[in-house]
Amino acid sequence: MTQFSPLYEGKAKIIYATADPDVLLAEFKDDATAFNAQKRGSIQNKGVMNCAIASHLFQYLAAQGITNHFIAQVAPNKMHIRRVEIIPLEVVVRNQAAGSLCRQTGLPLGLALNPPLVEFYLKNDDLGDPLLTPDRLRLLQVATDEEVIQIRQMALAVNTHLSHFFAECGITLVDFKLEFGRRPTGEILLADEISPDSCRLWNRDESDPEKRILDKDRFRQDLGAIEEAYALVMQRVLAHSVS
């Protein structure tokens, strides 16, 4: 399918139009950013690894009944996706306390959260992606009350399936970020990506609090061995069936 000029370039992907107005091409980049792009760098082969991981996980979730924008992986670092209007929300699901939750609440790292915590953030780098209360969500009108309920339900369903998937890969899904989009029909689809860039993943074979980290925290915290961690996630994910 013909690739056209870029429609949008974000921190991790470039989005292109194609000959089909309903299909876009997502190209995954090796660029790495943290703290709302205040820290920048590059991770060798990250685009290829994240594309492979996301493609596999989108197929797995589709088999579990989670509708998403993935169509097909068409190159090592490229996938075709359905065109959606991205809802400007970042939806974070937390199974254990980590990251900003620990910093803002004083909860100890690794504290199990039962039920999982679901948080909505405004997708706006200039504002620092602020956490939204239900009233702020309603005030900003970025999604209807019905859409927010549906997105929350979908996020929890994704969490159930991905937690099981990663557990079978010997990995703990600590927390993760999701984005959603609207189809012209109003249907809500899971969008963006699922990868070590957007998930906090701990290796169950490691007890050391630094060695167990298999995600972008290795870049955030200057822990090194970033490529090796992403490669291990890719190896374990691709070895798991998508059905």
Curated annotation (Swiss-Prot):
UniProt cross-references to SUPFAM superfamilies, sorted A to Z: SAICAR synthase-like
Gene3D superfamilies: ATP-grasp fold, B domain, Phosphorylase Kinase, domain 1
Any GO MF annotation of the entry: phosphoribosylaminoimidazolesuccinocarboxamide synthase activity
One matching Pfam family: SAICAR_synt
This protein's record includes keyword Ribonucleoprotein: no
Enzyme Commission numbers on file: 6.3.2.6
Cystines in this chain: none
The entry's keywords: ATP-binding, Ligase, Nucleotide-binding, Purine biosynthesis
Family to which the UniProt record says this protein belongs: Belongs to the SAICAR synthetase family.
Protein name, per record: Phosphoribosylaminoimidazole-succinocarboxamide synthase
Organism: Thermosynechococcus vestitus (strain NIES-2133 / IAM M-273 / BP-1)
